[in-house]
């Protein structure tokens, strides 16, 4: 890690393979918490590159425990969080509305790190017991049209950095990764992001993947559709700005 940190402190960026290697090592517990904190802090001081984000995504997906729902078409509705607006868990609520409308939802979430409450906090407070058993989650999906996957049970790297993220209490690049590493590999994703820069980065990344997507950013700063201003929505077909009245 010392070589990687020295390289980054010279204002250089990581290639895709190097970024993947670092996050794989984090997932395997090779680095201590001080090294991981220093590494995460680098990306608080500058924007992440597309190559770095791709490498981090590659690492988490390589290490993850995948779920197989026999080709069932599902959707995930998720936000990066970190917009500083202190709203309630809108994407989590939206998942239940969509499931109630008859669509299959494979919701992937975590405890809040840069916010008061993440989707896992909400689901757990309702008495739900987290699990990573494929058959049990499939039964929930069949019976209720929704299942919930608590990220640390599927991603060792997220489990290892959880305490560090909570101690920092700030938005890190792991906020960006959560929506990109759903272990059920949903066929459609609706993703709210906290900045236009992040919306563009996500669009570049997801254009190279097979799943359908909508990326949402409210121009007044929310990582979801806003009731108080315009919202930009980006899909494979292009992008458009909608007013609150149009929505």
Name what the model sees in each region.
Residues 79-84, 109-115, 154, 219-220:
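Acidic, glycine-rich active-site loops and adjacent beta-strand->loop/helix elements
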Residues 1-87, 101:
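Acidic, glycine/proline-rich low-complexity segments that act as flexible tails and inter-domain linkers
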Residues 7, 62-65, 87, 102, ...:
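Glycine-rich anion-binding loops and their surrounding alpha/beta cores
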Residues 30, 80-83, 103, 113, ...:
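Gly/Ser/Thr-rich helix-start
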Residues 70-78, 106-112, 174-177:
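Core alpha/beta catalytic barrel or barrel-like domain that forms the active/cofactor pocket
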Residues 40, 88-144:
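A glycine-rich phosphate/pyrophosphate-binding beta-strand-loop-alpha-helix module
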Residues 13-21, 30-38, 48-55, 89, ...:
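Conserved active-site and cofactor/substrate-binding residues in soluble primary-metabolism enzymes
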Residues 35, 106-108, 215:
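Short beta-strand segments at enzyme active-site cores
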């Amino acid at each position: 890690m010392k070589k990687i940190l020295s390289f980054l402190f010279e204002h250089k960026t990581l290639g895709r393979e190097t970024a993947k290697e670092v996050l794989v090592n984090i997932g395997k517990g090779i680095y201590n918490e001080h090294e991981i904190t220093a590494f995460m802090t680098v990306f608080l001081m500058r924007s992440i590159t597309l190559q770095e984000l791709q490498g981090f995504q590659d690492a988490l997906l390589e290490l993850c425990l995948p779920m197989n729902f026999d080709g069932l078409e599902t959707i995930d509705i998720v936000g990066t969080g970190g917009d500083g607006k202190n709203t309630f868990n809108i994407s989590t609520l939206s998942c239940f509305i969509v499931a109630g409308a008859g669509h299959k939802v494979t919701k992937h979430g975590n405890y809040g790190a840069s916010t008061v409450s993440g989707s896992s906090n909400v689901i757990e407070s309702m008495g739900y017991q987290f699990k990573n058993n494929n058959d049990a989650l499939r039964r929930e999906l069949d019976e209720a049209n929704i299942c919930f996957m608590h990220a640390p049970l599927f991603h060792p790297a997220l489990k290892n950095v959880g305490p560090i993220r909570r101690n920092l209490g700030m938005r890190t690049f792991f906020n960006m990764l959560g929506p990109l590493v759903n272990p059920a590999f949903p066929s459609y994703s609706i993703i709210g992001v906290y900045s236009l820069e992040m919306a563009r980065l996500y669009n570049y990344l997801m254009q190279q993947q097979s799943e359908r997507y909508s990326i949402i950013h409210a121009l007044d700063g929310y990582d979801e559709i806003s009731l108080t201003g315009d919202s930009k929505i980006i899909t494979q077909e292009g992008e458009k700005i909608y007013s609150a009245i149009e929505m």
